[in-house]
A protein has these predicted regions:
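Mechanotransmission and gating elements of multispan inner-membrane complexes involved in transport
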Residues: 172-269
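Transmembrane alpha-helical interface segments in multi-pass membrane proteins
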Residues: 289, 297-343, 376, 384
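Alpha-helical transmembrane segments
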Residues: 30-58, 339-346
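A short amphipathic helical element positioned immediately N-terminal to and/or at the very start
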Residues: 3-12
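A structural signal for hydrophobic secondary-structure junctions
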Residues: 63, 73-202, 206-216
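Short helix-loop junctions at transmembrane helix boundaries
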Residues: 314, 329-376, 390
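Hydrophobic alpha-helical transmembrane segments of multi-pass inner-membrane transport and secretion
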Residues: 15-42, 263-298, 321-330, 379-387
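C-terminal membrane-exit region of the final transmembrane helix in multipass inner-membrane proteins
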Residues: 367-408
Length: 408
């Protein structure tokens, strides 16, 4: 206990030098933690948007459907499967979809798209696309009008259409014949992924089924939303065994990039912080070497009157750790305030919106960091302080008391 008190007082003997070191540590941690929170917020947003808009957590397909979107390769007995899936533990909601490639045409332009036929009520339980349509941009199949279509803002701009405009969709039906129909635009959505937006249009299941001449109780896709997306792989494997005639894929297989984000973001953040702490560690070592040089005579006197080398080593280690922890405390406090503030108001990157949306990220990002990260950083700083104290302490132990006392 006495060594701890002495070490704490020694830290503040040179207030300016200690303050500079503490400020350097705090600045490094603020930069590292805020950058980590920013990256983490962007990654989590991308993951949430993917589940909510694009993939759900698990998808069923006919094994041959994914090869070329052949409309004949369907999932049979869809209604029965949906009812059974809802009873499966861990499943929150399910819906079925029709999918077919098509050509969307207006008077000005043609574009290739994927038509998605949906059951509006079930679709809204699994996906959040309806939330991406603001009040001025129409609705998501709230009316019972026939041949309605919801398209993206990006596609509407390309095709030069607006609400109540008509789009002609041409595609191959169940019998292999080229067919098509005109659909009226009732809603225009905008997600954070402009590339995905341009490729997908949404119509009612019954409208598309009629034109496709697809038999009832058959679908191209079943989407499953879980209570916990971390259980997707386990539940998907169980469902694959239960339904061997279909392919059950969890989100990590459907979107490998999202799987990479969730798996390696923690590792990337850890490496990032290690680099910062490594640089700060060298700064601490340099400072403590200066301290040893300035206190050569004092250390020599302490050893001359009987302080053991072990106690000298521990005292210097405590001084180094105190410097590191005080810097960490200030750094984490400032980081917490910044992250909480920008986590509410967001960081506006509107100047780069087009580029960010092309890869599926929002123009306004919200930093977020789990509380456990602060505990982990504190431990890492503590360990850094101990490691940084070793070399200066060894230098102090090599001092000869008789020569050290005579040092001016």
């Amino acid at each position: 206990m006495m060594l701890i008190k002495i070490a704490w007082r020694n830290v503040w003997r040179s207030k300016l030098r200690s303050a500079v070191v503490i400020l350097a540590i705090a600045s490094g941690l603020v930069g590292g933690l805020f950058s980590s929170a920013w990256m983490n917020g962007m990654a989590n947003q991308r993951v949430r948007d993917t589940f909510s808009i694009e993939t759900a957590h698990i998808q069923f397909h006919n094994p041959e459907f994914a090869d070329n979107f052949d409309v004949k390769k369907t999932i049979l007995a869809t209604k029965e499967k949906l009812e059974e899936l809802l009873k499966t533990q861990g499943v929150k909601a399910v819906t079925s979809r029709l999918k077919t490639p098509a050509m969307a045409a207006t008077a000005t332009k043609n574009m290739g798209v994927t038509i998605v036929g949906v059951h509006p009520e079930k679709e809204m339980e699994v996906f959040g696309l309806y939330k991406k349509i603001d009040t001025a941009s129409g609705e998501f199949f709230n009316n019972k009008k026939k041949n309605s279509i919801v398209i993206s803002k990006a596609l509407a701009k390309e095709l030069k259409v607006k609400l109540k405009s008509k789009i002609v969709l041409t595609f191959q039906d169940y019998n292999g014949e080229i067919t098509g129909a005109a659909f009226k635009v009732i809603g225009i959505y905008k997600t954070t992924n402009s590339v995905w937006d341009k490729m997908h249009v949404f119509v009612k299941d019954k409208d598309l089924r009629n034109v496709l001449e697809l038999p009832m109780d058959q679908s191209h896709e079943i989407d499953i939303l879980l209570h916990d997306y971390n259980q997707a792989a386990i539940i998907s494997n169980q469902l694959q065994q239960k339904y061997p005639d279909i392919i059950s894929e969890d989100w990590s297989k459907i979107q490998p990039y999202i799987n990479f984000i969730t798996k390696y973001m923690d590792i990337m953040m850890g490496v990032f912080m290690l680099i910062i702490l490594g640089a700060l560690g060298f700064g601490i070592v340099n400072t403590m070497l200066m301290v040893i040089l300035e206190r050569t005579r004092e250390l020599g006197m302490l050893m001359a009157i009987g302080m053991t080398k072990r106690r000298v080593f521990v005292m210097i280690m405590f001084e180094t750790v105190f410097l590191a922890l005080v810097g960490a405390l200030f750094g984490e406090l400032i980081s917490m305030l910044l992250i909480n503030y920008y986590g509410k108001v967001g960081i506006d990157l509107s100047s780069m919106a087009e580029g960010l949306e092309a890869i599926g990220y929002r123009a306004i990002t919200f930093p977020e960091l789990d509380s456990i990260r602060y505990v982990q950083i504190t431990i890492m700083v503590f360990v850094t302080g101990i490691i940084a104290s070793i070399y200066p302490a060894i230098k102090a132990l090599k001092l000869d008391p008789a020569n050290a006392i005579r040092t001016i």
